[in-house]
Amino acid sequence: MHKTVLLQEAIEGLNLKEGSWVVDATFGGGGHSLEICRKYKNVKIIALDQDKNALEKAESKFKDCQISFHHTNFRDLDKVLEKEGVKEVDGIIFD
């Protein structure tokens, strides 16, 4: 099991504001995204992971968050952003 490291430092380093768009390009267990959801109620997260099982497990933990899950590799980020109608993001997490 992957343990999220430098969690607070990573979140603070993003310098997010309410209404920001964030990509979690290697979602996994969703540690960073969950902390973002707790800290910012109006931040939108786009979560990518190749492990469909990880995404399915996470859905119940994130029901109160503004998050969209995508079963894909981060190399397809441009396609995901186009599908979401997002032209730019305010932060990207790779962990």
Model regions and ranges:
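Short helix-loop-beta connector
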Residues: 15-21, 87-88
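Conserved alpha-helix/loop element of class I SAM-dependent methyltransferases that forms part
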Residues: 3-18, 35
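Conserved SAM/SAH-binding beta-strand->alpha-helix loop
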Residues: 51
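Conserved SAM-binding loop of SAM-dependent methyltransferases across substrates and taxa
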Residues: 29-42
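Conserved SAM-binding loop
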Residues: 58-59
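Conserved class I S-adenosyl-L-methionine
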Residues: 18-28, 46
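A short acidic, Gly/Pro-enriched loop at the edge of an enzyme's catalytic core
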Residues: 79-94
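Conserved SAM-binding strand-loop segment of SAM-dependent methyltransferases
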Residues: 62-77
